[in-house]
Every structure is written in C-alpha cells, then in structure tokens.
C-alpha cells in the first residue's frame, strides 16, 4: 500500500514550510524523518511546530510525464516580468491584473490563488488558505534536502494536467530563492530567473482557471486530492 506523508511547519500562526511524499510502507520512517528535519531547517525562520500527517492512498495513483523545461535568458527582474507578460499575452490574456496580483502576494498562503481568467475574479473559497495542489511526488525523489527545481516541476506538472487550468505563475516564498516559473500544457515549464530580488518577502502562485462554474469543484478536487506520481528523467 502507498501512503501520503505531508509536513507543515509553523512559527506561531505563520506557515513557513511544507513538503510531501508518496511512499510505500517500508519507506515511511525515512521519509518522515527527512521531512521533519526539513521543517526545522528553513530560510523563513525556525519552526515552533512541525506536523507530519500520514494517510493511506485510497485512490488509484495517476502517473504523468513531467512538463518539458525551457529556460529563457533573463538578466534582471524587469526582463523576468517581461517574460511573464509575453506568456500571458500569448494566451490572449491582459497581463496587468494577473501580474499585479502575483507581485502583491506577500502574506504566506498555504495554497494558491484560483483566478477565473474570464472575469479576473478569485474563485478560492477561503482566500487565506487558497487552493492547495497536494498529494503528489516524483520519481527518483530521495528526500535529500530541498530541491526547488524538481519540486516546482512536480507541482507544475500536476497542475497543468488539470483540464480547467490553462496556466500557472509562481514566485517562491523562500526569501533567498529568486527563480520562479510560468507553466502550462502548451508552453511547458518556463523557468524564470530573477523573478524577484533576493531577500524580498513576497511569493505565491496563481492557477489560471478557464471553465464553467460547475467545474470549479471538480478542478479543486483534482488539485487537492488526486494522487499523482510525476515521471521525471534525469535533470
């Protein structure tokens, strides 16, 4: 049987770190130990509480391929924002409201903004919690410290597989990690350096939703509950 293991680290009421694995029973102890240590050692500050939750996987595990990776040459934050602008224009979207929202995400959210691209309206039921893309892992994950790139690619690949999500934008909430991305099924994973300045206390992600009102629940259920294993080649 497979198990979902999730870690959440907090300082007071502030979320500072989260990570997860999907493992077989024989690998549970090692995964739990690695996630606990990771929760205690995070650039957002020391954790006052680390919670590790273990649940059996009860749905069939879906295997998907990782998105292809593209890495444009970017020299500074202005050029990074220009890359995002061009990606959004390529989807026939007005970049301004999307990017203004992205760069205003300063209070840590456990999840993402779910943005209806038709009316530029936020759809997440709880704006403080957001919509969480969870219950996923990737092949070859040995839990040897944090791998920003692989973990981001894993999450982006799962999100892009959702029929109602046409794109995702992300800035890491780690203050010293300045690489973000744009991702979609059409464009793949566009890795963008200098998306923010080192030390900036901002970060978050936006899922771009296009669909019917009745499909919101289906979309959120897939993102939060469908177990997914992302197949990655050696990167």
From Swiss-Prot:
Signal peptide: none annotated. Keywords: ATP-binding, Biotin biosynthesis, Ligase, Magnesium, Nucleotide-binding. Transmembrane segments: none annotated. Its EC number is 6.2.1.14. GO terms for molecular function: 6-carboxyhexanoate-CoA ligase activity; ATP binding; magnesium ion binding. Pathway: Metabolic intermediate metabolism; pimeloyl-CoA biosynthesis; pimeloyl-CoA from pimelate: step 1/1. It is an enzyme of class 6 (ligase). It comes from the Bacteria. Its cofactor is Mg(2+). Homodimer. Belongs to the BioW family. HAMAP family: BioW. Catalyzes the transformation of pimelate into pimeloyl-CoA with concomitant hydrolysis of ATP to AMP. This is 6-carboxyhexanoate--CoA ligase. It comes from Desulfovibrio desulfuricans (strain ATCC 27774 / DSM 6949 / MB).
């Amino acid at each position: 049987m497979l198990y979902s293991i999730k870690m959440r680290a907090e300082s007071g009421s502030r979320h500072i770190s989260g990570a997860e694995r999907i493992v077989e029973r024989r690998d549970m102890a090692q995964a739990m130990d690695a996630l606990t240590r990771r929760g205690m050692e995070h650039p957002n500050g020391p954790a006052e509480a680390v919670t590790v939750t273990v649940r059996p996987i009860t749905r069939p595990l879906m295997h998907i391929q990782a998105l292809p990776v593209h890495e444009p040459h970017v020299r500074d934050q202005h050029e990074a924002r220009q890359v995002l602008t061009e990606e959004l224009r390529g989807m026939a979207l007005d970049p301004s409201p999307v990017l203004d929202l992205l760069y205003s995400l300063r209070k840590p959210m456990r999840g993402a903004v779910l943005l209806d691209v038709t009316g530029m309206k936020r759809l997440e039921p709880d704006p403080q919690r957001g919509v969480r893309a969870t219950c996923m892992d990737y092949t070859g994950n040995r839990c040897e410290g944090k791998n920003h790139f692989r973990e981001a690619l894993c999450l982006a690949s799962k999100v892009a597989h959702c029929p109602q999500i046409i794109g995702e934008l992300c800035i890491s909430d780690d203050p010293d990690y300045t690489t973000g991305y744009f991702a979609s099924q059409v464009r793949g994973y566009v890795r963008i350096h200098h998306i923010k300045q080192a030390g900036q206390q901002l970060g978050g992600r936006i899922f771009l939703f296009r669909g019917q009102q009745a499909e919101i629940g289906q979309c959120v259920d897939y993102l939060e509950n469908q177990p997914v294993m992302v197949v990655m080649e050696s990167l």
